[in-house]
Amino acid sequence: MKKIAIFGSTGSIGSSLLKIIKDDQKNFKIELLTVNKNYKKLIKQVKLFNVKNVIVTDYNSFLITTKLLKNAKVKVFNNFDSLNKIFNTNNKIDYSMCAISGFDGLKPTLDIIKFTKTIAIANKESIICGWNLIKKDLKKYKTYFVPVDSEHFSIWSLLDNNKKNNFEKIYITASGGPFRNLSLKKFRNISVKDALKHPNWSMGKKITIDSATMMNKVFEIIEAKKIFNLNYKQLEILIHPKSYLHAIVKFNNGLSKLLVHDTNMTIPIFNSIYFNTDKKLKSKNIDIKTLNNLNLKKIDNIRFPVIKILNNLSNEDSLFETIIVSANDKLVKLFLNNKIKFNDISNTLIKICNTPEFNKFKSMKPRNIDEIQNLNDYVSLKISSMSV
């Protein structure tokens, strides 16, 4: 029986994983679930899966959860420092899913590595801002890493048993989001409602907006560069409106491999927990007959100007990537609250790339989590004071 921990159990990734586990409960024991505020959904999960440990990071929600579960023999904690009370390094759990969105996901990702045999990371911020810290701990504690993002899981699968220097180029695909065919003149009037209508994927609000600006692809390129130890010249984005082709690897022996699957995050999540097994997924597979027209084209950096940000990045890890992630996070929140216009997200991010105050961080490597978090807080305050 595999012992499991899920960080962000009430979000889309965590909920999808629990749905998978529900169909195979005899083979899994959930040791820990964590949430921020959604205690109502958490309590349902606790009862359904007989969970004995939970972490609720929002204090008011923690108090309510403690009260509601006082007779359920469930240990309720309020922060991730309590992981030391739940787990020990001499008896590692089998699998941890890190699916907390935003910067809040970095600390628990780093904290759980020493307690788990395998870690699946669905949190972009953790990889972009803290990969050198994560990589160091993965090696130190001999923890196996599996990427969950569909593009990176696809690359990871395609590169199986291949030497990392055995390929020329890796392509990741983008649907183009809801505005791939919208007149450029109409971009200034894009509403929050418009931007949340993704044509192919059902996702959370933050990542849906990132998909609309194409910032999610900027992040995915940065992630791929870090995870697979590449340089930016080896990576390229292609527009693929149907979203069933996720990655292409062009090898130096004249062959190229591609990976296709349905637009359903359950597939990479399922394979992250069942890799190296012959477990069958109870979900529809893609109809191969639909592959008659891949319809691939280069991305338009006039329509999606944030792609230009990649030109400002060094192949060396730096704190500048934290600035980009933090600024985007704050700008998306402002847009979702109708404080700024859609175009302001891209324009402000590009402006930041050309600001000397921030450019100095391009030569600075992140040394610890406090440095990353302090810079995140600083950038968030700076964006709030900027004239966007």
Curated annotation (Swiss-Prot):
Question: Does the UniProt entry include the keyword NADP?
Answer: yes
Cofactors (names): Mg(2+); Mn(2+)
Pfam families for the chain: DXP_redisom_C, DXP_reductoisom, DXPR_C
| The protein's annotated pathway | Isoprenoid biosynthesis; isopentenyl diphosphate biosynthesis via DXP pathway; isopentenyl diphosphate from 1-deoxy-D-xylulose 5-phosphate: step 1/6
Identify the InterPro entries for this entry: DXP_reductoisomerase, DXP_reductoisomerase_C, DXP_reductoisomerase_N, DXPR_C, DXPR_C_sf, NAD(P)-bd_dom_sf
**EC?**
1.1.1.267
- Gene3D superfamilies with a match to the protein in the record: 1.10.1740.10, NAD(P)-binding Rossmann-like Domain
Q: Name one GO molecular function term.
A: NADPH binding
Q: List positions binding NADPH.
A: T10, G11, S12, I13, K37, N38, N123, E125, G204
The residues the record assigns to binding 1-deoxy-D-xylulose 5-phosphate are: K124, S150, E151, S175, H198, S211, N216, K217, E220
Binding-site residues for Mn(2+), renumbered to this chain: D149, E151, E220
Q: Which GO terms describe its biological process?
A: isopentenyl diphosphate biosynthetic process, methylerythritol 4-phosphate pathway involved in terpenoid biosynthetic process
Q: Which reaction does it catalyse?
A: 2-C-methyl-D-erythritol 4-phosphate + NADP(+) = 1-deoxy-D-xylulose 5-phosphate + NADPH + H(+)
Keywords from UniProt, A to Z, are:
Isoprene biosynthesis, Manganese, Metal-binding, NADP, Oxidoreductase
* Job of this protein: Catalyzes the NADPH-dependent rearrangement and reduction of 1-deoxy-D-xylulose-5-phosphate (DXP) to 2-C-methyl-D-erythritol 4-phosphate (MEP).
Q: Which family does it belong to?
A: Belongs to the DXR family.
Its protein name is 1-deoxy-D-xylulose 5-phosphate reductoisomerase
Q: Which organism is it from?
A: Pelagibacter ubique (strain HTCC1062)
